[in-house]
Swiss-Prot record:
Cited function: Specifically methylates the guanosine in position 1516 of 16S rRNA.
UniProt similarity note: Belongs to the methyltransferase superfamily. RsmJ family.
Protein name: Ribosomal RNA small subunit methyltransferase J
Gene: rsmJ
UniProt binding sites for S-adenosyl-L-methionine: 121-122, 137-138, 173-174, 195
GO CC annotations on file: cytoplasm
Amino acid sequence: MFTGDGFWHNGVVSYIGMVIILLQTPIFFNQQYPSLVDIAQRWQLVWDKDAAFELRFDQNCLSLHKRDEPKLDGISVDFVSGAVAHRRKFGGGRGQSIAKAVGLKQGVTPTVVDGTAGLGRDAFVLASLGCKVIMVERHPVVAALLEDGLRRAYEDAEIGEWMRDLMSLFHGSSISALADAAQSSGTEIDVVYLDPMYPHREKSALVKKEMRVFQTLVGADLDADGLLAPAMALATKRVVVKRPDYAEDLDGVKPSMVIATKKNRFDVYVKSAMK
């Protein structure tokens, strides 16, 4: 069982866990704003006047901006309003493909580790359907955005109570976190969900904006194939891998079943029945 800096406590997550990443990340921000200074210190971010990215804190929201593309809107994590809130209310509930992939059904609501959290959208969908979700994110800037999104969601009158119960964040290497958790006798995780970054062919404005920003910020997930083995060791029921429809199988391993959508697919690696 993980305690302290780990993300396990009695088999579930009850707080935001964080480990210190020794490699400091350069970022630009207004040093006159104490809130930004505090965020930088917490996430081991180093002020750099020549950094490619800027963090801003406006209207109680942390956002990331690509400095050489000032016309791009900032990227932030918002679980309270916008597209994710609309999907929570009108997205199809447990009939959604992602819900089927993780094994959600009547009487079964799995505990899920999202090993590649990103902006937390898929994790939020699962949490809104009742799953307890632990998000793992290794990049400190992305983790800072996630933490800020969680903070605002926890404070929200409509969703705050269940968000505090069901969604939490762990900052660290996904491969190491999954491998370490798999060796813990107190760990009980039904499903590990993975969505490694993969080059997109779509040309929509949203994809272009986010992929341009994220690929510049974090780079490609060159070690993505290394996620499958520790994920399989940790999950008691199944591992779900979200892939573009044209992508090869993760680590070259054929899934037990595939749930296809219009643009993506969910490769499901079954270990035991959901019950």
